[in-house]
Curated annotation (Swiss-Prot):
Residues 1-37 are annotated as: Disordered. PROSITE patterns: PPIC_PPIASE_2 (PS50198). It is found in: Nucleus, Nucleolus; Cytoplasm, Cytoskeleton, Spindle; Cytoplasm. Pfam families: Rotamase_3. This is Peptidyl-prolyl cis-trans isomerase NIMA-interacting 4. Phosphorylated. Phosphorylation occurs both in the nucleus and the cytoplasm. Phosphorylation at Ser-19 does not affect its PPIase activity but is required for nuclear localization, and the dephosphorylation is a prerequisite for the binding to DNA. The unphosphorylated form associates with the pre-rRNP complexes in the nucleus. GO terms for cellular component: cytoplasm; nucleolus; nucleus; spindle. Residues 35-129 form the PpiC domain. It comes from Bos taurus. SUPFAM superfamilies: FKBP-like (SSF54534). The lineage of its organism: Eukaryota, Metazoa, Chordata, Craniata, Vertebrata. Belongs to the PpiC/parvulin rotamase family. PIN4 subfamily. The keyword Calcium does not apply. Residues 1-41 are annotated as: Necessary for association with the pre-rRNP complexes.
Length: 131
């Protein structure tokens, strides 16, 4: 009798362990999948005058990546694309602005106006995605 009871509880234990590991896997994925991240592009200029020129180009209808390639002093070859950035991986003012912006597209960007000042210089930021 006792061996049957043990094997019975053993099966139940295995079932619980399997479902337990599944839920722990979901928990492990939860923060990554639900973690706040934005797909960011920016134009970075050290000089305020240069960033204002870039802002005028954007307002005149130029695509964000083209303005970034022409004006940005960082990541210009990628059209200002910084890729996916998570909370805590950006400097304070940049992060606040990035998470406040709506998602937009290169030919009709919604960007920070006025530019955001950080220790790196002045940024015009746009967001292409959020997850």
């Amino acid at each position: 009798m006792p061996p049957k009871g043990k094997s019975g509880s053993g099966k139940g234990g295995k079932g619980k362990a399997a479902s337990g590991s599944e839920s722990s896997e979901k928990k492990a994925q939860g923060p990554k999948g639900g973690g706040n991240a934005v797909k960011v592009r920016h134009i970075l200029c050290e000089k305020h005058g240069k960033i204002l020129e870039a802002m005028e180009k954007l307002k005149s209808g130029m695509k964000f990546n083209e303005v970034a390639a022409q004006y940005s002093e960082d990541k210009a070859r990628q059209g200002g694309d910084l890729g996916w950035m998570t909370r805590g991986s950006m400097v304070g003012p940049f992060q606040e602005a990035a998470f406040a912006l709506p998602i937009s597209v290169l030919d009709k960007p919604v960007f920070t106006d006025p530019p955001v000042k950080t220790k790196f210089g002045y940024h015009i930021i746009m967001v292409e995605g959020r997850k």
